[in-house]
């Protein structure tokens, strides 16, 4: 039966910059490692492609001057706050988000990382940055037209049957326009802001110099400031190549469509003839936002099927193929007129390398099949840096206390938030710094839990024959892998 499409369906395309950090970071799954914009472990090919060129010294000097001016303005505002009551540290913290906004896109991106990583930067600082928005006025029309000529060889009026000059979303890295192809297909066109690459490159050079200075102090060395900035620079450079976003999107969905559980998942079609490093053209999709439960029910769609598709996307993508969507907030998930979930904005992708995937499968096998908590503890040590070593018997008991409830209740009754808090406490006790990829995938499960409560509150996941079959097959594969390793 075809669902009736009402006024709740609307055209949609989004990219993460247009959403406040508060919406992205409504869940808190923090162990001890910050979550950077993309998680990419063991993959160097894209990193090599996405490196930004070093800017000339005069350009860097100009950005240093601009940065110094903004810092001076912050100091003046801070001095004005001093007569007020309250600790001076809190007064400084309250000034920082506005300073980051004034400094521009690179610092706004870094501010969004602070907002989503209270475990690394502290709750009070993180809380202040959650209101940081990345919305700026659109670029000048003539600059946009020049970019089209440079990237696609002609102006938008000649490339498209129609092109809306006014973008419907505008942020520091890119802006997005509606357009229509000559073939009649409606599309959205994401355009990189002219000149942004050089500005970001200059800012990153400044941040790298600053990180070198910060590491002269003990706190800077403990936070690995240079590594943090280097990783941030790689990820931001990758975000500036729209071809990588399009490739990630297509690779991800092709993995999922290989299984029947992937039938309710789709992504916008990329129009490669109109896609380059700085222009990304995709089909325009109409749909209902995933957290609009009333509209989804009114349209006649099955909330259980939608939640199953979301869970499958994280499990199959992350644990089997090592590629998962890294930002499942509601603005990136819509339900189309066929009842499929449309995933948007693949600027944030999580990548888990084969070794870590193997360790994760071994951890699942040790905890849930063999109930060998000592073996599980050794696997955790292999997965991350354990700062506090304890006797093996005590570590095994601590893991057993954590894992036993997982084996005694159905997953449908579990709270991923509670599991996250317990795991966080366990990690704190041992000073475990798990790979950021695992922290990132944990956040996606918390988003899914929220949608589960909205769309399928009475659904028992482990009573569902389709999912139990999927997990049973997964565990059989893990057992076979384990057995073959023993035989070898």
Swiss-Prot record:
Organism phylogeny: Bacteria, Bacillati, Actinomycetota, Actinomycetes, Mycobacteriales
> Could you give a GO molecular-function term held by this entry?
ATP binding
Membrane-spanning residues: none
Q: Which InterPro entries match?
A: ABC1_dom, Kinase-like_dom_sf, Prot_kinase_dom, UbiB_kinase
One of the Pfam families matching this protein, by short name: ABC1
Family membership: Belongs to the protein kinase superfamily. ADCK protein kinase family.
Lineage top rank: taxon: Bacteria
Q: Which GO terms describe its cellular component?
A: cytosol; peptidoglycan-based cell wall; plasma membrane
Organism of origin is: Mycobacterium tuberculosis (strain ATCC 25618 / H37Rv)
What's this protein's name?
A: Uncharacterized protein Rv0647c
